[in-house]
């Protein structure tokens, strides 16, 4: 029986460990690897902020914010009182400059394996107020992706839009089944919705409306299919291959004012099938691990082999 555990170290001392679920893909992949059909020479560890329980049907992380190559692998064979245990150990490092609130970790068979450039990626991490119009407030309170998030407010009782110029991204190769996901902080009960816009020019954009989750506090939106984005264009002239600006509109409920903390926005490639790439294992931490900037954390994935 295979048993996987992630072990976290800081300054050489163990600070946490969490057990994993090996996914259905992972079981197939490891079986093929033992049969010599698949390569496992390159690996990567992924870290995220979603706390949804791990299932063997997971195909990706809930909300990944950092991925790093596995530095090396080794074996650990020990005999105690005539009982021998066998394990494979993979190690990776989260460097000093990365900060985040780790609630999930996973391992993939390769660091980067995409059949096209239209893979899962970050679109915005909301860590620099100077990148946005209307001067949102910057704060470290409740930030989970990086050190900071931006607080965007309504214009009193009216909606207010914040815009940021970005390096052009190409959405033309994503399908209607791919998804967007937003990480945000709902500060009060007066939020009606958040509208995300993708501009190719000042008048030409796609938009999608995010209905806020119930309650206040840190939230992850549901998966937003790109079908909902592409079907809502301001004109017929939107160029999906040249999205160069993002807009975030904060809309309060009638007669109220509101504010929202924006933490991260990413796009997930949901339907590009590659039999050699997928989530092998996922672990959800019972207690979140706060990774501070300036401190390196080493992570070990130990796969015990029940021979």
Label each PLM-derived region with a short phrase.
Residues 1-103, 108-121, 130, 141-160, ...:
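Small cysteine-rich, disulfide-bonded extracellular modules of the LU/uPAR three-finger superfamily
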Residues 92, 182-184, 196, 248, ...:
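Preference for bulky hydrophobic residues occupying beta-strand positions
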Residues 103, 242-246:
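Exposed beta-strand face motif in extracellular beta-rich ectodomains
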Residues 119-130, 164-171:
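Beta-sheet-rich sandwich/jelly-roll-like modules and their strand-loop junctions
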Residues 156-235, 242, 255-261, 266-270:
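Extracellular ligand-binding interfaces
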Residues 247-256:
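Short beta-strand-plus-loop segments that form exposed binding edges in beta-rich domains
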């Amino acid at each position: 029986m295979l048993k996987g555990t992630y072990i976290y170290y800081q300054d050489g001392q163990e600070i946490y460990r969490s057990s994993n679920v090996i996914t259905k893909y992972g079981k197939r992949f490891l079986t093929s690897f033992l049969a010599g059909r698949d390569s496992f020479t390159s690996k990567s560890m992924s870290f995220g902020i979603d706390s949804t329980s791990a299932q063997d049907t997971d195909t990706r992380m809930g909300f990944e914010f950092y991925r790093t190559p596995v530095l090396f692998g080794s074996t650990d064979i020990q005999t105690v009182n005539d009982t021998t245990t066998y394990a494979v150990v993979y190690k990776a490092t989260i460097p000093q400059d990365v900060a985040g609130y780790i609630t999930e970790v996973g391992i993939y068979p390769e660091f980067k394996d995409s059949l096209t450039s239209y893979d899962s990626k970050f679109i915005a991490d909301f860590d620099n107020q100077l990148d946005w119009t209307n001067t949102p407030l910057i704060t470290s309170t409740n930030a989970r992706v990086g050190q900071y998030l931006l607080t965007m407010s309504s214009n009193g009782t009216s909606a207010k839009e914040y815009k940021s110029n970005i390096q052009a991204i190409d959405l033309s190769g994503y399908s209607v089944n791919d998804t967007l996901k937003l990480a945000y902080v709902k500060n009060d009960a007066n939020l009606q919705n958040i509208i995300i816009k993708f501009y190719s020019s000042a008048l030409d954009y796609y938009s999608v409306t995010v209905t806020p989750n119930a309650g206040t506090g840190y939230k992850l939106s549901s998966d937003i299919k790109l079908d909902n984005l592409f079907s809502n264009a301001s004109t017929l002239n939107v160029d999906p291959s040249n999205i160069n600006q993002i807009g975030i509109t904060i809309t309060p409920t009638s007669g109220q004012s509101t504010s929202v903390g924006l933490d991260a926005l990413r796009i997930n490639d949901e339907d590009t099938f590659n039999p050699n790439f997928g989530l092998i294992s996922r672990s959800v931490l019972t207690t979140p691990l706060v990774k501070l900037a300036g401190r390196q954390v080493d992570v070990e994935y130990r796969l015990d082999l029940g021979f």
